[in-house]
UniProtKB/Swiss-Prot annotation:
The keyword Lipid metabolism appears for this protein: yes
Chief localisation class: cytoplasm
Name of the protein in question: Phosphate acyltransferase
Organism: Pelobacter propionicus (strain DSM 2379 / NBRC 103807 / OttBd1)
Family: Belongs to the PlsX family.
NCBIfam families: plsX (TIGR00182)
Length: 346
């Protein structure tokens, strides 16, 4: 299954993207199409001794910058690397598109070229978080900041399907992020969403608090993109700060330094667990195809793992399973019934 990589997106493109693509092809045997400036990409590939690797180049004459307006750039820059990567998916020449460029443009390109899955009103960006018991999927982390209850219900279905078919969780437990576990907590959005989700076939556990995310008892955590992005950035900042604080304390005395020698292996394993590069990119859910959004400052390892994850995402037919799950749950009719009950109550 060939992966189209937007080689011109990202803070250090195309150097990091090319090296990550080469590593993915070499380590996982995944065929790659690099999309971008042909001459620059050819020169980058020459540095990596790629003879025998299934990597080709698709020329793109334009690049969407990090500060470009996402929707305008996609429409104006028809030959941009990110848009053409999704065009390759649409044409069946690649099974997924991976980009570390402008995340808004990546999402816009995916929606514009591949369109939304029937029954999905808004796309969502998901992210895997490390927990005490393994991994938890959180969505949305920034795709749609202003949501309605039906959007969150759709996110829950997409997250459940992804957790089941890509993460390999047999019966994913779904939770709705709120400011308390009691039914009386939350705001209008979460309370209405809670009512909807309780009527679905999902293994729904109700409200969860932010502190519960890392316990690992919930497999899929649902929230709007505004809250989700704050959760993501806070978690990244906390992990980085905790590591730096610990290092400062270790360096304060020779006793601490000596003790570190005995637990150095454990610290290395911990750093690996909280390193975003280990989890690759964030899947874009809700489009008729596969898109993977990477951090703008992604490392070679992050790009490599994002390509691997994109291949798994495509191989497991997530979009098709989402359609099946939507049909099974009749979310829109549930919302209409809920609205009627509220009208009667008023």
């Amino acid at each position: 299954m060939r992966i189209a990589v937007d080689a011109m997106g990202g803070d250090n493109a195309p150097t990091i993207e090319v090296e990550g693509a080469v590593a993915a092809c070499r380590e996982f045997g995944i065929p790659i199409t690099l999309v971008g400036d042909q001459e620059r990409l050819r020169k980058e590939l020459e540095l990596h001794h790629c003879s025998g690797l299934d990597i080709d180049i698709f020329h793109a004459s334009e690049v969407v910058g990090m500060h470009d307006s996402a929707s305008d750039a996609i429409r104006r820059k028809k030959n941009s690397s990110v848009r053409l990567a999704f065009e390759l998916v649409k044409e069946g020449k690649a099974c997924a598109a991976v980009s570390a460029g402008n995340s808004g443009a990546t999402m816009a390109a995916g929606m514009f070229v591949l369109k939304r899955i029937k029954g999905i009103d808004r796309p969502a960006i998901a992210q895997v978080f490390p927990t005490l018991k393994g991994k938890t999927l959180v969505l949305d982390i920034g795709g749609t900041v202003d949501c309605k209850p039906i959007h969150l219900a759709q996110f829950a279905i997409m997250g459940e399907v992804y957790a089941r078919y890509v993460m390999g969780i047999a019966d994913p437990v779904v939770g709705l992020l709120s400011n308390g576990e009691e039914e009386s907590k939350g705001n209008e959005l979460t309370r209405e969403t809670n009512t909807l989700l309780r009527k679905t076939s999902l293994n729904y556990a109700g409200y969860i608090e932010g502190r519960d995310i890392f316990k690992g008892q919930i497999d899929v955590v649902v929230c709007d993109g505004f809250v989700g992005n704050i959760v993501l950035k806070l978690s990244e900042g906390l992990a980085d700060a905790a590591g730096r604080m610990l290092k400062q304390e270790i360096l304060k005395s020779w006793v601490s330094k000596l003790g570190y020698l005995f637990v150095r292996g454990a610290f290395k394993r911990f750093r690996r667990i909280v390193d975003y590069a280990e989890y690759g990119g964030a899947p874009l859910l809700g489009i008729n195809g596969v898109g993977m959004i990477c951090h703008g400052g992604s490392s070679v390892k992050a790009i490599k793992n994002a390509i691997r994850l994109a291949e798994e995402y495509a191989r497991n037919g997530v979009a098709e399973h989402v359609v099946e799950k939507l049909s099974e749950n009749h979310i829109e009719s549930l919302q209409r019934d809920n609205a009627k009950l509220q009208a009667v109550g008023e």
